[in-house]
C-alpha cells in the first residue's frame, strides 16, 4: 500500500478538477480525499495499491479537459488504512 499527498497548481479550480479526481480515484479503487485550497491549488491524499496511486498521479498531471496543470508536488505519507472511500472534503 502507498499513500501520497499531492498539491496541484495551475488552472485547477472552477474546471471540475475535484469531481474528476474523485471519479478517477474511485475508478482506480483508491481511498482518500480532494479539496480546493485558498491559494488556488487543489490538494489531495490518495491511498491504495502503489501502481494505482501512480496512475492517479499521472492523471493529475493532465486533469480534466478544461484544466491547465502547471505542477504536481507529491509527498509520500504513512499509510493509514482508515478510509473506505474517496471524496471531496473541505
Task: Describe the predicted segments one by one.
Residues 1-90:
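Intrinsically disordered, low-complexity, mixed-charge
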